[in-house]
């Protein structure tokens, strides 16, 4: 059983924890959030026993092998960096990093910490549609170019347009949100 720590207490994390539970291979042990109370409120129903509002304490005192990072995009680099420095396995939501310099920094850090691993949680590579497209491409004799359009209407967009901003990190450049950064990977 792999011990799992999480950074980010949101609907994506709920979905990931539900999926992890179905494998029978993960046990949630530690939760980091901006407040310890929120970490406990989120993590207790999943069986977590350690709750943190300090990233340093989370990594120093948390009992986990794998950390799942589902925070605002702009925070991924620093959180993944700390995980690597603590020789953790990392599953980070997409986009893992917001620019090439961050990726290169993590790549260098991984070379110095061979026990650590980083995986981007890019679910599209596991969908039937992706595999169907992959098979179709294999059957084509020559590919000289492609134009593929993927559209997704955000369930949060109407609230933002109405002036209600319950998710400040979703559509702002400050948190590396918006259509290109958040959905552009698809």
What are these regions (language model features)?
Residues 46-109:
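Beta-loop-alpha module in the N-terminal Rossmann-like domain of NAD(P)-dependent dehydrogenases
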């Amino acid at each position: 059983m792999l011990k799992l720590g999480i950074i980010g207490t949101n609907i994506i994390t709920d979905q990931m924890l539900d999926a992890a539970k179905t494998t029978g291979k993960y046990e949630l042990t530690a939760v980091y959030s901006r407040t310890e109370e929120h970490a406990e409120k989120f993590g207790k129903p999943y069986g977590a026993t350690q709750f943190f509002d300090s990233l340093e304490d989370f990594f120093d005192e948390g009992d986990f092998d794998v950390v799942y990072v589902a925070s605002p995009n702009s925070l991924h680099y620093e959180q993944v960096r700390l995980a690597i420095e603590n020789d953790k396995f990392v599953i980070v939501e997409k986009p893992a990093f917001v620019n090439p310099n961050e990726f290169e920094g993590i790549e260098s850090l991984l070379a110095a910490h061979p026990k650590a691993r980083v995986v981007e949680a890019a679910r599209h590579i596991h969908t039937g549609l992706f595999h169907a497209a992959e098979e179709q491409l294999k059957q084509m004799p020559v590919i000289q170019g492609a134009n593929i359009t993927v559209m997704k209407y955000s369930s949060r967009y109407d609230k933002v347009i109405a002036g209600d901003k319950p998710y400040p990190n979703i559509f702002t450049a400050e948190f590396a949100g918006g259509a290109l950064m958040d959905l552009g990977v698809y």
